[in-house]
Regions:
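Short helix-loop "hinge" at the ATP-lid/N-box region of the Bergerat-fold HATPase_c
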Residues: 78-79
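ATPase catalytic-site recognition across NTP-hydrolyzing enzymes
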Residues: 136-140
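Helix-loop junction within the histidine kinase core
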Residues: 11-22
Length: 196
């Protein structure tokens, strides 16, 4: 059923019919609900799982249903590629545009503008990481990483493409980078103001 829903969402996006329905919410509480729902998996898999935030209340305009799909895909991938006794962290940080340019130089030039504040949603893991050759294609529809074909947990290659589409609908940016000393970090920037 999940695969069918993701295919339908991908198809809607390709045809221009994936609609954004934003409402005013507390992004921290929303993220905390998602954290709680994944915590059982972390306990079962013996993975250290944390939620860290600059602020305990983050007023933002976003589509709850679609942003939940972003979190679900990013966290599902993190859990799939993180072994027992490793860790996964969800991190929320608020930035001005100037703060973003200082924190992530060269990452967001031209894609983030205006006076809006942005929230950076990061999913960080200490798993096996992502090959450099895969980083350029990882958000393409149906792309599977080089190690996926040899894995018994191979995905469909739809999830990260859907993440990119949803983030763009929110007028945001998403990318992946290495987590030091090992693992991967997916960062999602979305504006918190309705006007954005």
């Amino acid at each position: 059923l999940l695969l069918v829903n993701q295919l339908m969402d991908l198809r809607k996006n390709q045809s221009g019919n994936l609609q954004l329905r934003v409402s005013h919410n507390d992004l921290y509480l929303f993220t905390q609900e998602i954290y709680i729902s994944f915590n059982q998996i972390a306990v079962k898999e013996r993975i250290t799982f944390r939620l860290e935030s600059d602020e305990s209340g983050i007023d933002a305009w976003f589509d709850r249903v679609l942003l939940e799909k972003v979190f679900f895909n990013l966290l599902s991938n993190a859990f799939k590629h993180t072994a027992p006794d490793e860790s996964i962290t969800i991190r929320l940080q608020l930035f001005s545009v100037a703060g973003l340019q200082e924190q992530f130089p060269g990452r967001i030039s031209g894609e983030v503008r205006g006076t809006s504040r942005y929230v950076c949603l990061s999913v960080e893991d200490t798993g096996k990481g992502i090959d450099d050759s895969d980083k350029f294609h990882i958000f393409s529809p149906f792309y599977q990483g080089t190690d996926e074909s040899e894995s018994n947990t191979a995905g469909t290659g739809i999830g990260l493409s859907l993440v990119l589409s949803i983030v763009k609908l929110h007028k945001g940016v998403v990318w992946v980078e290495d987590n030091k000393p090992k693992g991967a970090v997916f960062r999602v920037l979305i504006p918190v103001n309705r006007e954005a």
